[in-house]
Amino acid sequence: MSQRKYFGTDGIRGHVGLSNINPEFVLKLGWAVGCVLANGARKKVVIGKDTRVSGYMLESALEAGLSAAGVDVALLGPMPTPGIAYLTQTLRANAGIVISASHNLFEDNGIKFFSADGGKLPDSVELAIEAQLEKQLQTVPSAKLGKATRINDAAGRYIEFCKSTIPSLSRLSNLKIVVDCANGATYHIAPNVFSELGADVVPIGIKPDGFNINQECGSTAPELLREKVIAVGADIGIGLDGDGDRVILVDSLGNLVDGDQIIYIIAKDRHQRGVLHGGVVGTLMSNYGLELAITSLGVPFQRSKVGDRYVLEMLREKDWKIGGETSGHIVCLDKTTTGDGIVAALQVLSIMVKQNKALHELTAGIQLLPQTLVNLKTNNAALLASNPDVIQAVKNLEKHLNGEGRVLLRPSGTEPLLRVMVEGANASIVKQQAQMLCDDISQIDKKMTESLPST
């Protein structure tokens, strides 16, 4: 595959005003996308965004660039990422564009894309866009300029879709739900989804001001949600991130329920009903307890690289339906085309109602193992991960764990770090073993550095 200059694993992201998240680049990006998609024909693209103040600026730049390429634009306004994927399909658009930096704070923003079927753009299209970006911008003749329209009922359309992902007879009328919208794109959607299904909803994180997205709230900061669940005596808390593609839960006792546990609940229910369709996909970072719980059901479990993009790729490759990440990216391909926090939460709520069980009862079948993650500073992360002495040290520790734990080394793709993760049955022992392994690796790193020729 050709080397990418602009696209990362999930679009283009960065600090607003720095790197490529600026009006000049984004306008040309819109033009390049338009040229590649249109290829001389009239096309339509939908654009949605989260609640960051920079979203207005970037939306205008994209709109101008797309229009210059002769592409019509449908503006959705604030809309969860999975909602944009859904509306790309239903509006028969040729692509969907998301302006969001997901769970990051407001200073960051990003651009990512969906194809006409609501999936990720193929690599070939991303590479074609990159090639187009190297050319000089040329505006189509005035008679062929693209037009922009606003889809005023976008939120209502997506709300109805979310409700349709659980059985039509499902009622949430006996449930009290706290939902934290992270002052993000779900603020005007998630509370309505749950209340229209009959739940008693206590919403928080629903007052976005352009600057408070993900700020001490949402799926990455669940303490406020936990406190509210206990304070109001709720049955469940639902924590979404700024663009609505992640979800974590809190049970009535105040316990955090992460993505691994949510995957288990959904997969077990589908397996018991005979509608799971194959196995379950986690990632290299998924807790070993999830693997044990899933395989104990007689269900296959596979790990992809970290990132919802890779979970989706493996699900499609195997024609499986359920997968996700510990962070709360939950993919139900029998319902959606991408990770969807609201839809994942609805699956769990439907199971609670159908089985007449509390959330803590549904998580009883999965025992998460204590996990220690150490970020080891090194300039030789990739070399260390493949070093024979390091590999032997890992094998020695795995032998000591005796099949009741796991060791994982991951070089960071963005920082001079080697991430060392150890899982096992005993938290204090796992922590001790992780530190001992890191000490061994540090010694190997030191010897390696000393042996390298100086520059």
Swiss-Prot record:
Pfam families named in the record: PGM_PMM_I (PF02878), PGM_PMM_II (PF02879), PGM_PMM_III (PF02880), PGM_PMM_IV (PF00408)
GO biological process: carbohydrate metabolic process; peptidoglycan biosynthetic process; UDP-N-acetylglucosamine biosynthetic process
Gene Ontology cellular component terms for the protein in this record: cytosol
InterPro entries, per the entry: A-D-PHexomutase_a/b/a-I, A-D-PHexomutase_a/b/a-I/II/III, A-D-PHexomutase_a/b/a-II, A-D-PHexomutase_a/b/a-III, A-D-PHexomutase_C, A-D-PHexomutase_C_sf, Alpha-D-phosphohexomutase_SF, GlmM_bact
This enzyme's EC code(s): 5.4.2.10
Root EC class: isomerase
Keywords: Isomerase, Magnesium, Metal-binding, Phosphoprotein
Cofactor comment: Binds 1 Mg(2+) ion per subunit.
PTM field: Activated by phosphorylation.
UniProt modified residues of type Phosphoserine: 102
Residues binding Mg(2+): 102, 241, 243, 245
Function text: Catalyzes the conversion of glucosamine-6-phosphate to glucosamine-1-phosphate.
Family: Belongs to the phosphohexose mutase family.
Protein name in the entry: Phosphoglucosamine mutase
Natural source organism: Legionella pneumophila (strain Lens)
